[in-house]
């Protein structure tokens, strides 16, 4: 789960991280009073969406102006006008895709005198099963660009959970960032605070880009992006309260309410599978035979007829889907239950695209019989390879 920048900064402030004072604006008529509560003489007006690249982004609507989603104002009135221009408009960045995201919140904060821009992130390293620090002197730009053009400017290391975080980790970050004197001490404390927030709040990723050195020599968190482990949200009620469902894919949101693991992709063949490994294998074989999967969808091991029906509704709500492949290996899940769910779903949604079903495992013969006697136009797949070839042929011709 992701949160907005202003929420991330409030959270980090509660852990002692140095951040600028700011106000969130939900309505245009709130902007002037919000900016007036801040000191100035410079105000930064930021569009709040769950995507990076806001500063370099462009709004679809001409009324929003030609600049991106991060703008500078030199007066309270100008800050209010900029907020009014951006609220309700659609911001397109390299992370939103061409559709963009509607800006429903604006964050106005005090400007900062910047001497240097740095990069600091914490993330879960799947390879080592540890929390890793990623730091670079090249802050203020996409870390992917730095990794591609000047990888030597990125330093990363992990923290052994057995011994935990120590001061030397903070000093290592400070020296990698070229800090010196009192800045090193500041950095050590900041690293401690960020690490504690990361662990206590079950974060998956904490990115500060940029972390700035101000002209007075002090450090400040200028932008923050935080992602949380969905599997740990049950014990993070305060984090759950920060969730903004308007920023989430409607299909993924609907799937989460039925405990379906769904991720939207860009292809044309919808997939419904039980088990993450089998789902990935199904997507791979679709690509092998020349097509692209439209989604990852794992219905899990205990799917009911209602759950299968909901899965079909989610898949067919994607206008890019030209065909559907159902691939079920019945272990805990019975193939006859899946078959009943498929029939009910096809009848309810009025399926207009080709459907290939491959069943194997518990009660497979019952499942195949239910589908065969349904009178519906469902193509049977003998095995995974056969099913994949049939759906690709049905879609591609």
Swiss-Prot record:
Entry's cofactor comment: Binds 1 Mg(2+) ion per subunit.
Binding site for Mg(2+): 209, 223
SUPFAM superfamilies documented for this protein: Glutathione synthetase ATP-binding domain-like (SSF56059), Succinyl-CoA synthetase domains (SSF52210)
InterPro entries: ATP-grasp, ATP-grasp_succ-CoA_synth-type, ATP_grasp_subdomain_1, Succ-CoA_synthase_bsu_CS, SUCC_ACL_C, Succ_CoA_ligase-like_bsu, Succinyl-CoA_synth-like
Residues binding ATP: 46, 53-55, 109, 112, 117
Gene Ontology CC terms, in alphabetical order: cytosol; succinate-CoA ligase complex
Cofactor names: Mg(2+)
Statement: the UniProt record of this protein carries the keyword Ligase: yes
PANTHER family listed in its UniProt record: SUCCINATE--COA LIGASE [GDP-FORMING] SUBUNIT BETA, MITOCHONDRIAL, SUCCINYL-COA SYNTHETASE BETA CHAIN
NCBIfam families xrefs: PRK00696.1, sucCoAbeta
Protein family membership: Belongs to the succinate/malate CoA ligase beta subunit family.
Name recorded for this polypeptide: Succinate--CoA ligase [ADP-forming] subunit beta
Recorded name of the encoding gene: sucC
